[in-house]
């Protein structure tokens, strides 16, 4: 199996709802299945990134409820881990009522583990005098430990699969953009079918999102009233914002993710798709460009981390979309790809991530706009040069510099944001 297929298998999958609370639900479901008894308590411990992303986002199939705690309770009661990131498709009114009771009675809780810097979800479920535990680490579905009544069923020394252990990331991290483009030669008809499924899935949720009076609605209204042109940039922004609106509002429709993120999947897939269709690019070329978009998104997150203090839609998916557009028009022209990457990162590389929520659609719009603009400039031989700011000589060097900023320069950003968010919670009535 190639690096491309490892990336797709691990990071590009359908997800019903925001991927962090859904991963919490999945972990709870894993533990509850092993428990084999009626669930009495659910205790989840999560890293700052998962805590932040599940803080204010609406969870599907809950009637508008928000947060990791309802996701944990509902996932444990569903107890169908085979559904993975579509775990909440197994919810119904009866299970929701039971989950709400677990939460309101204090028998379902979520704790923050501040010292964890990677994706980490640890869920303990009790019932009938028994205790079961499931731990996910380094990926939304990467199981590293399963226990029941103190008996270890799986541990980190025996990963579920080579792909789940994310060994491919060490290889991907060292690749060049030219080498990633070379991976597109590995695509077969089955890969193209899967990529097209992602397009169709994300288009469907975008159409549902257009029924909401949220960000996508107002971008569309700006076009209708003449404030924005009715062009490919505006139509792309309406499409991506509407899809994000639907997802953040908890509408019960799956989205094809990228880099383990639904919003990143929306940008990485729909932007190159819509631009390609506008310019009558052959469908296979569009699909191959989307594959490249996924690879670039995964590559950048290998450097910055899965849940960095900076917005993944901006510095990962937006970059992937820009590269995809250049690839559609100019093929593997590395000079133009370097220009596109450097330009979009210089533009929106400092966009903060303050958790998943309705406002993410605004960042999706900004990322969409910046990706198309950067690609257009690059295709015309213009862009930000190494003489400016933290931009490097190449796409790879710029991403390395961005990684340094995210890791060292913004080390206190997440702590500060979490403090603010926790203070808000403590003052809620």
Swiss-Prot record:
GO terms for biological process: L-cysteine catabolic process to pyruvate. GO terms for molecular function: L-cysteine desulfhydrase activity. This is UPF0597 protein GSU1527. Signal peptide: none annotated. HAMAP family: UPF0597 (MF_01845). It comes from the Bacteria. InterPro entries: Ser_deHydtase-like_asu, UPF0597. Belongs to the UPF0597 family.
